């Protein structure tokens, strides 16, 4: 059974929300890749569209968008995701994970690309009575 911590970022508000998903919802993400747009109902955000932007596995190895497949690979990199060189032109062999989501991924990062009619706080149950808009 797959369990994921999904960090959904809201570009309009500049906030991020952490959502734990498991079982059927998590299985719907397996096989998706970085850059894919999925329905927000998987995360409890009905009416929203969410784009997968990255993630990491249990050992902390990051997912690289241009590395095919779900497995880990040691690649020679000069810059980019997961590596910042200390000197100009420096290259290093780093362990990275492919762009496809597999059951051993722990965290999935995503951003909202299409908004629904309800607010995110209301859908996730984070809205308190003071924050709720007054019905007039």
Curated annotation (Swiss-Prot):
* One Pfam short name: Ribosomal_S6e
Q: Which GO terms describe its cellular component?
A: ribonucleoprotein complex; ribosome
Tell me, what is one Gene Ontology molecular-function annotation carried by this entry? structural constituent of ribosome
List each coiled-coil range.
none
The source's domain of life comes to Archaea
Q: Which InterPro entries match?
A: Ribosomal_eS6, Ribosomal_eS6_arc, Ribosomal_eS6_CS
Q: Which UniProt keywords apply?
A: Ribonucleoprotein, Ribosomal protein
Q: Which GO terms describe its biological process?
A: translation
Q: Ligase: present as a keyword of the record? A: no
The record's annotation in PROSITE patterns points to: RIBOSOMAL_S6E
In the record, the note on similarity to other proteins reads: Belongs to the eukaryotic ribosomal protein eS6 family.
Q: What is this protein called?
A: Small ribosomal subunit protein eS6
Q: Which organism is it from?
A: Methanosarcina acetivorans (strain ATCC 35395 / DSM 2834 / JCM 12185 / C2A)
């Amino acid at each position: 059974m797959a369990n994921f911590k999904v960090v959904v970022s809201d570009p309009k508000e500049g906030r991020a929300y952490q959502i734990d998903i498991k079982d059927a919802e998590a299985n719907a993400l397996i096989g998706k890749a970085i850059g894919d747009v999925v329905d927000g109902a998987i995360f409890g955000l009905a009416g929203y569209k969410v784009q997968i932007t990255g993630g990491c596995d249990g050992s902390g190895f990051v997912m690289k968008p241009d590395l095919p497949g779900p497995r880990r690979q040691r690649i020679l990199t000069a810059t980019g995701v997961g590596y910042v060189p200390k000197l100009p032109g420096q290259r290093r062999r780093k362990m990275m994970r492919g762009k496809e989501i597999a059951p051993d991924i722990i965290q999935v990062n995503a951003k909202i690309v299409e908004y629904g009619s309800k607010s995110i706080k209301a859908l996730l149950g984070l809205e308190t009575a003071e924050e709720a808009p007054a019905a007039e």
